[in-house]
C-alpha cells in the first residue's frame, strides 16, 4: 500500500449529502474481486449519460478537477451497503483523501485499509473547504498527515484529529497484511535465525 505523507493539489467539491456506496460504485461493477479497473465505474451514474458520453456538469468531468486526488463531500459519505469496492474504486481513480463532516463507519474503516485518508471536520470547516475547492485550478489544498493539518490556498490552516494507529498505518503504507508482518517481523526473524542454526532440522 502506498504511504500517505503529504498530499497537495486541487480538491473536487461535491455538495451532496448521503452519497451511498451504490452511487460511488454501482452494482454492475461488483462482479470482480480485483482492485484495479474500478476507477472507470466511480460515480458512473453521475459521470456518464445513458449513451456513455460524459456528463459535462459532473465535477470530476470538469477540466479543473479531472485529476483531483482529494474530494470535499457532503455529510454521511459512504453510507449504504458495506461494499469494499467503494474505496477500491476511489483509490483506482486516484483519490487519496476524502473530507466530510461524517462517514459511514464501515466505509471509514475500509478507506484506511486501502490507503485513503478520510478526514472528519466541523460543518464550519467543511464550508471553508468547499469554498476553497470551488475556486478550481487556482486553489490547492495541502494535507499533511504527520502534522494533521489542511492548508488552504490563502495560507489558512485547519487541524484534524485521527486515531494514532490509523495514522501510523497510513504514514507507513501498512494494510492489514503489512501491519501483521510489521508487528511480527522480529519474531519471524528470530525463528528463521534459529532454524538456520539447526541445519539438521
Curated annotation (Swiss-Prot):
Secretion signal span: none
Tell me which UniProt keywords the record has, alphabetically: Amino-acid biosynthesis, Branched-chain amino acid biosynthesis, Leucine biosynthesis, Lyase
InterPro entries xref list: 3-IsopropMal_deHydase_ssu, Aconitase/3IPM_dehydase_swvl, AconitaseA/IPMdHydase_ssu_swvl, IPMI_Swivel, LeuD
- Show the catalytic activity: (2R,3S)-3-isopropylmalate = (2S)-2-isopropylmalate
Q: What is its EC number?
A: 4.2.1.33
Q: GO biological process: any one?
A: L-leucine biosynthetic process
Q: Which GO terms describe its molecular function?
A: 3-isopropylmalate dehydratase activity
Q: Into which EC class is this enzyme placed?
A: lyase
Q: Does the keyword Cell division apply?
A: no
Pathway given for this chain reads: Amino-acid biosynthesis; L-leucine biosynthesis; L-leucine from 3-methyl-2-oxobutanoate: step 2/4
Please give an example of a GO cellular component term from this record: 3-isopropylmalate dehydratase complex
Q: So what family is this one in?
A: Belongs to the LeuD family. LeuD type 1 subfamily.
Instruction: State the function annotated in the UniProt record.
Output: Catalyzes the isomerization between 2-isopropylmalate and 3-isopropylmalate, via the formation of 2-isopropylmaleate.
Q: Indicate the quaternary assembly.
A: Heterodimer of LeuC and LeuD.
Give the matching NCBIfam families: leuD, PRK01641.1
Protein name per Swiss-Prot or TrEMBL:
3-isopropylmalate dehydratase small subunit
Amino acid at each position: 500500500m502506498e504511504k500517505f505523507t503529504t498530499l497537495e493539489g486541487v480538491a473536487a467539491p461535491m455538495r451532496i449529502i448521503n452519497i451511498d456506496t451504490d452511487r460511488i460504485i454501482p452494482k454492475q461493477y461488483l462482479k470482480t474481486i480485483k482492485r484495479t479497473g474500478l476507477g472507470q465505474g466511480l460515480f458512473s451514474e453521475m459521470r456518464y449519460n445513458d449513451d456513455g458520453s460524459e456528463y459535462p456538469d459532473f465535477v470530476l468531468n470538469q477540466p479543473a478537477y479531472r485529476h483531483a486526488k482529494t474530494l470535499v463531500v457532503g455529510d454521511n459519505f459512504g453510507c449504504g451497503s458495506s461494499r469494499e469496492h467503494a474505496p477500491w474504486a476511489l483509490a483506482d481513480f486516484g483519490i487519496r483523501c476524502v473530507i466530510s463532516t461524517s462517514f459511514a463507519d464501515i466505509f471509514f474503516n475500509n478507506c484506511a485499509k486501502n490507503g485513503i485518508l478520510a478526514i472528519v471536520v466541523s460543518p464550519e470547516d467543511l464550508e471553508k473547504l468547499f469554498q476553497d475547492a470551488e475556486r478550481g485550478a487556482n486553489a490547492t489544498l495541502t494535507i499533511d498527515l504527520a502534522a494533521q493539518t489542511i492548508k488552504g490556498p490563502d495560507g489558512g490552516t485547519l487541524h484534524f484529529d485521527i486515531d494514532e494507529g490509523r495514522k501510523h498505518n497510513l504514514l507507513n503504507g501498512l494494510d492489514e497484511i503489512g501491519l501483521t508482518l510489521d508487528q511480527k517481523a522480529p519474531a519471524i526473524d528470530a525463528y528463521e535465525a534459529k532454524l538456520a542454526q539447526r541445519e539438521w532440522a
